[in-house]
Amino acid sequence: MRVSKYLLSTQKETPANAEVVSHQLMLRAGMIRRNASGLYSWLPSGLRVLRKVEAIVREEMNNAGAVEILMPMVQPADLWVETGRWDKFGPELLRFQDRHNRDFVLGPTHEEVITDIIRKEVSSYKQLPLNLYQIQTKFRDEVRPRFGVMRSREFLMKDAYSFHLDQETMDDTYQAMYTAYSNILGRMGLAFRPVLADTGSIGGSMSHEFHVLANSGEDLIAYSTESDYAANIEKAEAPMPTEPRGAATMEMSVIDTPNAKTIEELVEQHGIAIEKTIKTIIVKGASEEAPLVAVIVRGDHELNEVKVEKLDAVLAPFEMAGEAEIRDALGAGPGSLGPVGMTIPVYVDHSVNVMSDFAAGANQDGKHYVGINWERDLPQAEVADLRNVIEGEPSPCGKGTIGLLRGIEVGHIFQLGTNYSKAMGASVLDENGKAQTLLMGCYGVGVSRIVAAAIEQNHDDRGIIWPAAIAPFKVGILPMNMHKSHRIKDMAEKLYSDLSDAGIEVLFDDRKERPGVMFADMELIGLPHVIVIGERNIDNGVFEYKNRRTGEKQEIPFEEIVDFIKSAK
């Protein structure tokens, strides 16, 4: 491809509204352009990368025995009413009516549509198991789209759905998808980690996420230092306390804390050890009888909202209570709350349950209790795992300790069970002629998100460093002052022709530009290999080659260059 015939819209300056590196570089490299909040057009370089990601995903899905279909982006609301998600899904589900006042949604996911297809098309156990997938645009009306295509409203996704009569074939397909996802990310040259995950709003039992490792990742991954255990921090089980509750050595008393609104201020101003403090958080309850619930973790621990949401007494999805609600119910603000005399249901983390002589808010503004002890000063509360794990703690697998990594989720696989098939009456006749509700699996890959994640993992201060498998072009040709030298022009044209004839994807910079601009653009867009042609090269019978990732430079004889680039990784 000649740059003169190509839309290479690079920018020198970093856009002010781009928060993360991938968003900045995708804009600067001319890969995408914003049309509206969370909506982007893909320009030629971006689309070339997107199509390469899509091709690898498609190949590995086909290799795993899945069959491609295509479902509509617009879905009838009736299907969502059947599963109950019409009411459960929040405002991220874009709803609209056609000219006949019929309700529709712009699909954020396709469980309802695929289940409707299967219940109409599959009637016998002989047609199972079946694994169908599509690569389709999705839309989720995110409250705050950000990070470019990392969290956009419209995005490209591969979603697959499998149907089974028994758990054995469900497990087999799940493992096949696990392997396929590992192959997909491995072929793209990305460092990644599969992790145990929460099933979230889609529901189901078994679930794994696939994370591209990057320091900028939003997700925290807990892993064992001595086994292959890895889990999203939302899912990782905190270890049980190894020491029993200590005996009381203090009497409970009230202290004035007018300027201590946070745990840190309480510790700093009053000399209390942070491990002797607790955080009391008020969340929305699941019942009218208990509209508010108190959940408590130790002062140096972080509340795990996903774990809290799984408590029967807590409203799902998780929602913090507002200050006005809290004051109306408890008589004090969030910085002065504690379990002593609490009139709403109380759940404490295992680590809080073994505390003694601890400090907490007194449910009066500007006052705290110190020397609190369970059973003496307040009744035993409900106990559960409510916190995030901490680096260095024993791993839940029993081997090694917990380490923490940051990752970007690009894939998620679920065993859904009968959540959707039961709601929609998707069943088949088994060998005995008896109707059996189908087991379902669900497997998603964020195709457009992988592009951004790859950049987050592969860049430097000059631009993108594409892994070869998904680079927009394999090699760039940079002829120095080609328009002033027939020798350079002729050699560049011949090299372009030879490489193209060999099936190599080439970007030939034939612009009338200064060499500095050409070099900067080539490094910004991140092609793995660059060939420079100047007068000295022609005199010496060699091309100057540069590897984008390593920065290594070599002189390659004219006659060897095609084979060299073909074999370059």
From Swiss-Prot:
Keyword Aminoacyl-tRNA synthetase annotated: yes
Protein name from the UniProt record: Proline--tRNA ligase
Gene Ontology annotations of biological process type: prolyl-tRNA aminoacylation
CDD domains the record matches: ProRS-INS (cd04334), ProRS_anticodon_short (cd00861), ProRS_core_prok (cd00779)
Superkingdom per UniProt: Bacteria
Cross-referenced InterPro entries: aa-tRNA-synt_IIb, aa-tRNA-synth_II, aa-tRNA-synth_II/BPL/LPL, Anticodon-bd, Anticodon-bd_dom_sf, Pro-tRNA-ligase_IIa, Pro-tRNA-synth_IIa_bac-type, Pro-tRNA-Synthase_IIa_type1
SUPFAM superfamilies tied to this protein: Class II aaRS ABD-related, Class II aaRS and biotin synthetases, YbaK/ProRS associated domain
Keywords assigned: Aminoacyl-tRNA synthetase, ATP-binding, Cytoplasm, Ligase, Nucleotide-binding, Protein biosynthesis
Main location, first listed in the record: cytoplasm
UniProt GO cellular component terms: cytosol
Function, as annotated: Catalyzes the attachment of proline to tRNA(Pro) in a two-step reaction: proline is first activated by ATP to form Pro-AMP and then transferred to the acceptor end of tRNA(Pro). As ProRS can inadvertently accommodate and process non-cognate amino acids such as alanine and cysteine, to avoid such errors it has two additional distinct editing activities against alanine. One activity is designated as 'pretransfer' editing and involves the tRNA(Pro)-independent hydrolysis of activated Ala-AMP.
EC number(s) recorded for this UniProt protein: 6.1.1.15
Membrane-spanning intervals of the chain: none
HAMAP family: Pro_tRNA_synth_type1
tRNA-binding keyword on record: no
Pfam families: HGTP_anticodon, tRNA-synt_2b, tRNA_edit
Subunit structure: Homodimer.
Family under the similarity heading: Belongs to the class-II aminoacyl-tRNA synthetase family. ProS type 1 subfamily.
Entry domain remark: Consists of three domains: the N-terminal catalytic domain, the editing domain and the C-terminal anticodon-binding domain.
Subcellular location: Cytoplasm
Reaction equation(s) it catalyzes: tRNA(Pro) + L-proline + ATP = L-prolyl-tRNA(Pro) + AMP + diphosphate
PROSITE patterns to which the protein is assigned, alphabetical: AA_TRNA_LIGASE_II
Organism of provenance: Shewanella loihica (strain ATCC BAA-1088 / PV-4)
NCBIfam families: PRK09194.1 (NF006625), proS_fam_II (TIGR00409)
PANTHER family associated with the record: MITOCHONDRIAL RIBOSOME PROTEIN L39/PROLYL-TRNA LIGASE FAMILY MEMBER, PROLINE--TRNA LIGASE
Protein's gene: proS
Single GO molecular function: ATP binding
